[in-house]
Swiss-Prot record:
NCBIfam families: rpsB_bact. Residues 235-251 have a biased composition (Acidic residues). GO terms for biological process: translation. It comes from the Bacteria. PROSITE patterns: RIBOSOMAL_S2_1, RIBOSOMAL_S2_2. The keyword ATP-binding does not apply. Keywords: Ribonucleoprotein, Ribosomal protein. This is Small ribosomal subunit protein uS2. It comes from Geobacter metallireducens (strain ATCC 53774 / DSM 7210 / GS-15). Residues 232-251 are annotated as: Disordered.
Length: 251
């Protein structure tokens, strides 16, 4: 199991919270103290809670569920997109469209439109249009790609969300709650931890902190997917062996 160490958390600055005047009292159990007007997060609790979140995400992937990585603030965009892609999962790192989960059927129509536009440009169908029309189609494609590119292959709502900065992603979290989708989130000292199923207390502003925690969650997905593949392979081998024995008995 690829866990996270206290050293890694310290080096990435995961322990630095927000200014003491900008805090949510509900985060008090996760705060170690304050230094120079900044809250310091209790990393011992972060390590313990991270393990719980890691195990949950790994189990989701092992059972074949998809994880949607969400982080639209500038500091999170690259890590969310790159790490979700690395573990073959989906992501939203630009703008959360209202109804992305609760009205997924309508969102899927836009995804299908994006796929059709991609196909038109890939197979040359777009050449049948005028230059002006082709330019309009390309603008439409780029706009859809920006907001929906990370969920292009997502055929149904995800099994869980991994979120950076729940305060910034309230719409996504509210939609997940309505549908009973569990939420794993990196929760800073200014956030409300109550709606989060798996709280990871930590700095949600520093790029290094975001990258570290997001990459570890991607590792959890990969570990779960690998275990799932091994299970499926074992099952196939057992079925093949059983069929072989059956044929021998019949002979």
């Amino acid at each position: 199991m690829s866990s996270v160490t206290m050293k890694e958390l310290l080096e990435a600055g995961v322990h630095f919270g927000h200014q003491t005047k900008r805090w949510n009292p509900k985060m008090k159990p996760y705060i170690f103290g304050a230094r120079n007007g900044i809250y310091i997060i209790d990393l011992q609790k972060t390590v313990r809670l991270f393990k719980n979140a890691y195990s949950f995400v790994r189990e989701c992937a092992q059972s074949g569920e998809t994880i949607l990585f969400v982080g639209t603030k500038k500091q999170a965009q690259d890590a969310i997109g790159e790490e979700a892609s690395r573990c073959n999962m989906y992501y939203v790192n630009q703008r959360w469209l209202g109804g992305m989960l609760t009205n997924f059927a309508t969102v899927k129509q836009s995804i299908d439109r994006l796929k059709r536009l991609d196909a038109m440009f890939a197979d040359g169908t777009v050449e049948a249009y005028t230059k002006k029309e082709a330019l309009q189609l390309e603008k439409e494609r780029q706009k859809l790609e920006k907001t929906l590119g990370g969920i292009k292959g997502m055929g149904k709502v995800p099994g869980a969300l991994f979120v950076i900065d729940p305060k910034n992603e309230t719409i996504a979290i509210n939609e997940a709650k309505k549908l009973g989708i569990p939420v794993v989130a990196v929760v800073d000292t200014n956030c409300d931890p109550d709606p989060i199923d798996y709280v990871i207390p930590g700095n949600d502003d520093a790029i290094r902190a975001i990258r570290l925690l997001t990459s570890k969650m991607a590792d959890a997905v990969l570990e779960g997917a690998q275990a799932r593949d091994a299970q499926l392979q074992t099952g196939e081998e057992e079925m093949a062996a059983a069929e072989g024995e059956s044929e021998q008995v019949e002979a």
